[in-house]
Amino acid sequence: MSETKMQEILGLVKGAVQVEGERVKVVDEKVLQENISAIIFQGVFGDDATKAVARWIIWEAAQTLGIKPASIHELYMARGRGEAPLNFTVPAMNLRMLAYDSARAVFRAARKLDAGAFIFEIARSEISYTDQRPSEYVSAVLAAAIKEGYRGPVFIQGDHFQASAKKFKQDPDSEINAIKELIEEAITAGFYNIDIDTSTLVDISRPDLDEQQKLNYELCAEFTRFIREKQPAGVTISVGGEIGEVGERNSTEEDLEAFMKGFNRVKGEVEGVSKLSIQTGTHHGGVVLPDGTLAQVAIDFDVLKRLGELARKKYGLGGVVQHGASTLPDSAFHKFVEVQTCEVHLATAFQNMIIEHKAVPESLRQEMYEWLKANVASERKPTDTEAQFIYKTRKKAVGPFKKQFWTLPEESLKAIGEDLEKQFTFLFEQLNIKGTKAVVEKFIKAPEIHHAEPLAVKAGKKESTEGLAD
C-alpha cells in the first residue's frame, strides 16, 4: 500500500477517519459525509494507486458504519417457503451514468420510505461501455450510502453475466473463462448477487424441451458451482438463472420445468438459484420508433403470475424476474406487485433522464451524438433514422463522456439528483417496497467483510458487447 497515496486521501477527509493497521476507524462521521465526494472522485478518476487507496477507505469505512454489501438470497428463499410477504417487488437498478449521484438519490428515496429491499446492478455489457469495473461501481454505491447516512445491507448485483452466443460458438472455453473471470472480479469487489444468463444458448429448434434448455442449465449449474467456490465465508450469494432471452418469445411453464429439472439434476450438492428471469414481451431499451420515441409495450402479466407461482410452490424459489421494464408506462409498475413478481430490472429510463435533463448543456449532448456518428456508425441499420440510431446507441457514449458528466456544475448535479430521487420514490411506492427495511433486517444477516489492503485496480479489457443484453 502506498503510504504517500494513503496520506493524500486521508488529507481529503480532514481527520474524519484514521487507519489503524488493516482497519479504518471513523472518528467523525459528519466530516466524512461532508468530504466523501472528494474520495469517490479519486476512486473513479485518480491514477491506479490513488483509486485503490480511495476505494479501500470507502469499503472499510462503510463496514465500520454498518453499511455492508450483502446477498438477498435468504429473503428470496423465505418468499419461496411462504415465510416472507409477496406484496412487494424488488427493484434492481442499473446505474449507467453518474453512479454516485444516482445512488445518492436511491438512498434518499429509500430512507424517506424506510425501504431496504432494493438492488444496485450492472450488466457485463454495461461494465464495458460505461467504463465501470465492479470495484468502482461498489465504491460509488457505498460512498453514496455514507453520504446520505444510510445503514444496513446493500445489495449489489451482476446483471446479465451473459454468454455471447456468437463468441460461445467460436470458442466455448474462452467465453466460459471470460465469464468466470468477471464473476471472480465481481465477488472480490462486493457483488454478492449474480444473475447468470446463458439463455442466449437456448436452442428452440430442438424438438425436445430438455434439449432446448440443456446448454443453458448445464452452464448455469457450472457457473453456480464456481460462485459457491468463490463466495466469502458467511455469504450465500444470490444466483439467478434465466430461461428466456429478453426480446424473444414468451416463456412457458414447460420451459421453466425443463430448466429447473435439468439444473437440479446436474448442479451437484451446492445451493442452487434463488430466482429465474423469464420473457414476457419486453425489449431492453424499449422498441424505438422512427422519430426516436418509444412504442408502447405489452407485458403478459399473466405469464409472470403463473410462472412465479410455479417457481415458488414447486421449486422453493423467490419467484420470477422481469427484465427491460424501465421504459414501460408509469401505469404499469403496480401490476408487478399484483402478480407477485419477485424482482424487476430498471435501467434505460434513468440513463434517458440524465442525458435529456435540462441541466445538461445541449452542447454536451451534441458532442456525444457526434462521437456516436464517428465511432459507432457501423451499428446503424440501413432502416434506422438518425433519431433511432442515436437513441439505440447513445449508451455507448456513456463511458467516453463519464468525466464530463461527473464534473457538471454542482447545481446541475443537484437538479439531476432531485429529479432522479422523485423517479426512484415513485417506483419504490409503485413496487410497494415502503417499509421493507424490517423484512430485510429479519432475514438478511450480512457479515462484516474486511480487505486487509487495497484491491488491485483492474482496468479490464474492452470487450465487444455485440449481442450482449443490458
Locate predicted features:
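Alpha/beta catalytic barrel-like cores
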Residues: M1-G158, S164-K167, D171-E175, E181, ...
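Alpha/beta enzyme core
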Residues: R104-A117, S135-S139, A143-R151, Q170-G316
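Conserved, mostly hydrophobic/aromatic
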Residues: D159, V239, L276, H323, ...
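Glycine-rich beta-to-alpha transition loops that act as phosphate-gripper elements at the mouths
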Residues: H160-F161, I243, G319-L328
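Histidine/acidic-residue-rich catalytic or RNA/ligand-binding cores of hydrolases
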Residues: K167, V288-P290, P329-V339, I354-R365
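Glycine-rich phosphate-binding active-site loops on the catalytic face of alpha/beta enzymes
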Residues: D197-D203, V339-K358
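Short, catalytically relevant binding-site loops at active-site mouths
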Residues: T280-H284, S326-P329, F350-M353
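Structured mid-domain segments that build the active-site/substrate or prosthetic-cofactor binding neighborhood
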Residues: V321-G324, P329-D330, H334-T348
